[in-house]
Amino acid sequence: MLAEFGEHGRLYAGGTELLLAMKHDLLRYEHLIDVKTIPDLNKIDMKNGTLVIGSTATHRAIERSSIVKQNLPVLAEMETHVANIRVRACGTLGGNLGFAEPHSDPATLLTALGAKVTVQGKSAMRSIAVDKLIMGAYETSLAGDELLANVEIPLPAKSQRAAYLKFQLKERPTLGLALVLDLDGDAITKALAVIGSVSAVPTQSDKANALLIGTRSQVEKQLGAAAEALARAADPIDDLEGSAEYKRHLIAVFLRRAFIKALS
């Protein structure tokens, strides 16, 4: 049906973003294709060390899932604070990623966790890393005939620690920061910090990640420089959620907080 309707049709699941945009005449479609009743698209399961979440699983279902809580608590915690209770009850993970709203939580954390999505086209299926899926504000790399089927998240190794923190004044985050650290005793051997909501797409910085490697005491002294590198890479913008200058300040504050939380 999606291929048949082309640009006049749009997939519909929770509708928390899409219907609001249509209500305000920001988007217009002649056909909405309801995917909520497609079998298995709302399942949450573990497969060979990978957490697999169907695209129509709601934020609330993910938040409450015992599988998610036991295997990836950082994701369950993040979902607990997505938007408001109405959005969590109706909004879906696949819809969130597919709409590519810049002020959103999931893509930032999923990028740091190395997640990928499986998409089904008219004649073929393919896999896309989340950091390659989000191309810009409200823009993805999905083809016109593709359905986002599920999200696959590799579980962190026992030596890894992950944290996600955000700052928001309204219902959308001004900033979201995800941090994943690989530990060997007191040393951090690998680090990945991803900043979201301050600009169009979740962003990381090789320089910032390099500054987050070393002993805990060494890295603590380098957090300021790492935050500056991350801010330069993200290039925050002025918008309704805050000024670029304010967001740069928040990056420094929340990188330090995420570092402490990941190691606690």
Place the predicted regions along the sequence by residue.
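C-terminal structural segment of proteins
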Residues: M1-S264
